Amino acid sequence: MVDSILTIVNLYNQDFCAYQDFRSVNPNNIFNWNFKELTLASRQYINQLFNSPRFFNNLKYMENAETILWLLSFNFNFTIVSCGDCPNLKLKEKWLNRNFCTYINEVKYINHAFVKFVGVNSCEHSDKSHIDMSDGILIDDSLTNLVTSNAKYKILFGKEKDWNIDNGDRYVRCENWIDVMHEIERLKFMHKGEEVFR
């Protein structure tokens, strides 16, 4: 939904550009969950960025995500489940409230859809398996979250990275939000007349 990799890489390029050994990094060249390609940055630096208002102030939607989510909101409710810790989860919810939702009588909506945010504390849970998704579609870039989820339909999101290699081709891979829209339309067509999702 949002381009965290782009944001981290842009901030890294800003912060380290004056260093002698600096080489500008292209976000498309990030393939490691721990951002090992950012050779001058420590793991602590990356973690601090993920937990900083600066990161969320620079965070943008992925290409076409905002439009596709708006279109889907006419037919679907959203539960956004995200892993993190404090303050990361609080900042995520604040970003969503500012960029994704409208409030009507203290209930969050995007168009006519209900929007719910569920923060999963990474210190307490290693994945999202404790969240009941049995009546919905899980779109996730983490293979672990797909494997452990009870979601009715599962979409592996994003280009192949070291954290989402699906050697068994168990899941439909959507590399972008246009692909997601097409896959959801395909699911709706396959199950025409059935209540596929609540």
Regions found by a protein language model. Give the residues of each.
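Short, acidic loop-to-helix structural element flanking the phosphoryl-transfer center
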Residues: 51-80, 86-90
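Short catalytic/ligand-binding loop motif for oxyanion handling, primarily in non-cytosolic enzymes
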Residues: 1-5, 87-91, 126-127, 145-148, ...
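Short, basic/glycine-rich phosphate-binding loops at helix/coil junctions
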Residues: 36-52, 76-78
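Conserved Lys-Pro-Asp/Glu-containing loop-to-beta segment of HAD-superfamily phosphomonoesterases
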Residues: 107-149
